[in-house]
Amino acid sequence: ADGQNQVKLRGVVHFDGRYLANDDPNDLSDTWPATRIRPIIEGTVGGIYDFRFTPDFGQGRTVIQDAYVTGRFNPSFQVTAGKFKAPVGLERLQSAHDLRFVARAFPTSLAPNRDLGLQVGGKLVDSRLDYAVAFLNGSNDGASSETFGDVDINDDKEWAARLFAHPFAESDSFALRGLGLGIAATYTDQDGTVAQPLLPSFRTPAQSTFFRYR
């Protein structure tokens, strides 16, 4: 009753209708795919440790989207370990529950999705400044670590960092109160191979590839 220990069960299901005009039926088919089928188990232990486990059965495959534990030791110091969203893309960090459309915008494909690693973050300056620094296996732009079977295929790792400010959080103006300014970046130095080039390809919401590296 005090919220120190709790478990929540919920989920999200998204269906997408893909009907394309003048397309090559050998390349793309008109279809109703289940893009997300995600039962979610999350909770809190001891009022400090939060956990989340999210399998995904959408798109005809089984993937573990989230599997992490967060220690909320202090509002300014929280530690997350496991598989979680890299602290980079703004839209990517939004929950699938809160999206206005089933598919995210193209710029989100330029940022990594979920990865395995360790993250330190928190809120500073009366919660007006959020920060996060993560040490990760490394994943392609727009992709998650399951691209490589949720294992690292080399010794090189990736750093990701993010700062996001709410300078007018206490303003009387509704428009200013919701204004946020942020910056995020990643750094890695990894060499691919012919079998694993470590280069992403980019697709439209209809899953038609419109760009790939050579």
PLM region spans:
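Outer membrane beta-barrel
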Residues: 2-141, 147-191
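Detector for outer-membrane/organellar transmembrane beta-barrel domains
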Residues: 174-214
